[in-house]
């Protein structure tokens, strides 16, 4: 018999030692996110979490999301520290619009070759997002898959579970004629529209690291982490009769606002109530993007829109602004049988 070389998993491109090193690196930041309801620690086959005792009829709310091609821009610019915040934000913001308090979060990180420093930066960002939203990072999957991704490219996905009192679910059914719409300012494009962002960068020939906008590199505007609205919105829900909340993500104004409107209602948005942050003006000009397309692709400075009764507006604005939000009245709800569910005028 001829001698054969003994192959290992590492020879095939999977470094178990690197995976173990990553777990050791992130344990500290993950521990900081722990809620009292979580049982056990990292390393189990599954994560255990009790329901908070304050709920009489708890309803679980779940969501999953990614960060789209904002990830490609982050990889190109070698900036991995905030993409994890984006990942958490996209999930927990979708939960809180239904009145849910996020409980726990899990992540999926896949790459062709595991770079411990990069993965650690991403997961540290995820932990920071969990801290900002008050949920526990209870586990995840790090998949090193040679041949599936180019070099050290990676992809991430997030999964979140929250809880809401059954009688306090926010589903838009209470929205009615005369309700007022309040906007919550965004931190930038958040995590949507980045295929168009990257196309605009390509066509314009712009280097986002050297192009200045409002006194800082364009890259800082484009990679600003998605704002997490959980804590301020939960405080609002405790004090104010909120009828509906829309998270402005993919599809922008035209597609997200109708998701929370009952039949025979229309949202009328007052375009003069705010000014677009400069990054959106730059994108529109550099890409020669039509106004309708801007509102379909980007949040244009508005991360969430909240519908509530007119008598609650002043109280809501004061509470939101006191909790660090940039909130303003952006429009109203009108009774209408028009097929156009959103009007911007």
From Swiss-Prot:
An example Gene Ontology CC term for this record: cytosol
UniProt KW ATP-binding keyword: yes
EC number(s) from the headed UniProt entry: 6.3.3.1
Keywords: ATP-binding, Cytoplasm, Ligase, Nucleotide-binding, Purine biosynthesis
Subcellular location: Cytoplasm
Catalytic reaction(s) noted: 2-formamido-N(1)-(5-O-phospho-beta-D-ribosyl)acetamidine + ATP = 5-amino-1-(5-phospho-beta-D-ribosyl)imidazole + ADP + phosphate + H(+)
Molecular function via GO: ATP binding; phosphoribosylamine-glycine ligase activity; phosphoribosylformylglycinamidine cyclo-ligase activity
Residue runs in coiled coils: none
Pfam families: AIRS, AIRS_C
InterPro entries linked to this entry: PurM-like_C_dom (IPR010918), PurM-like_C_sf (IPR036676), PurM-like_N (IPR016188), PurM-like_N_sf (IPR036921), PurM_cligase (IPR004733)
GO term, biological process aspect, one: 'de novo' IMP biosynthetic process
Functional pathway: Purine metabolism; IMP biosynthesis via de novo pathway; 5-amino-1-(5-phospho-D-ribosyl)imidazole from N(2)-formyl-N(1)-(5-phospho-D-ribosyl)glycinamide: step 2/2
Transmembrane segments annotated in the record for this chain: none
Protein family: Belongs to the AIR synthase family.
Protein name, as recorded: Phosphoribosylformylglycinamidine cyclo-ligase
Record organism: Escherichia coli O6:K15:H31 (strain 536 / UPEC)
């Amino acid at each position: 018999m001829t001698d054969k070389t003994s192959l290992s998993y590492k020879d095939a491109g999977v470094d178990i030692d690197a995976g173990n090193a990553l777990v050791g690196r992130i344990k500290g930041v993950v521990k900081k996110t722990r809620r009292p309801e979580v049982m056990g620690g990292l390393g189990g086959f599954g994560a255990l979490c009790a329901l908070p005792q304050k709920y009489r009829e708890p309803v679980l709310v779940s969501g999953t999301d990614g960060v789209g091609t904002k990830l490609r821009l982050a990889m190109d610019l070698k900036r991995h520290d905030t993409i994890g915040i984006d990942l958490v934000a996209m999930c927990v913001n979708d939960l809180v619009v239904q009145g849910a308090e996020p409980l726990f979060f899990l992540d999926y990180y896949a790459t062709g070759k595991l770079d411990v420093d990069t993965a650690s930066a991403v997961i540290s960002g995820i932990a920071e997002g969990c801290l900002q939203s008050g949920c526990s990072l209870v586990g995840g999957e790090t998949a090193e898959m040679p041949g599936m991704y180019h070099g050290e490219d990676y992809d991430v996905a997030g999964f979140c579970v929250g809880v809401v009192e059954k009688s306090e679910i926010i589903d838009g059914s209470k929205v009615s004629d005369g309700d007022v719409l309040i906007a919550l300012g965004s931190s930038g494009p958040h995590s949507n529209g980045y295929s168009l962002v990257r196309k605009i960068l390509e066509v314009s020939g712009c280097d986002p690291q050297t192009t200045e906008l409002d006194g800082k590199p364009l890259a800082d505007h484009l990679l600003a982490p998605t704002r997490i609205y959980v804590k301020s919105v939960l405080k609002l829900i405790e004090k104010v009769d909120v009828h509906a909340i829309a998270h402005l993500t993919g599809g922008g104004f035209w597609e997200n606002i109708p998701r929370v409107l009952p039949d025979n209602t229309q949202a009328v948005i007052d375009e003069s109530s705010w000014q677009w942050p400069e990054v959106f003006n730059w994108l529109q000009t550099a890409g020669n993007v039509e106004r309708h397309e801007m509102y379909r692709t980007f949040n244009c400075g508005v991360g969430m829109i909240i519908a509530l009764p007119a008598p609650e507006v002043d109280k809501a604005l004061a509470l939101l602004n006191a909790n660090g939000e940039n909130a303003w009245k952006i429009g109203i709800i009108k009774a209408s049988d028009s097929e156009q569910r959103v009007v911007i005028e």
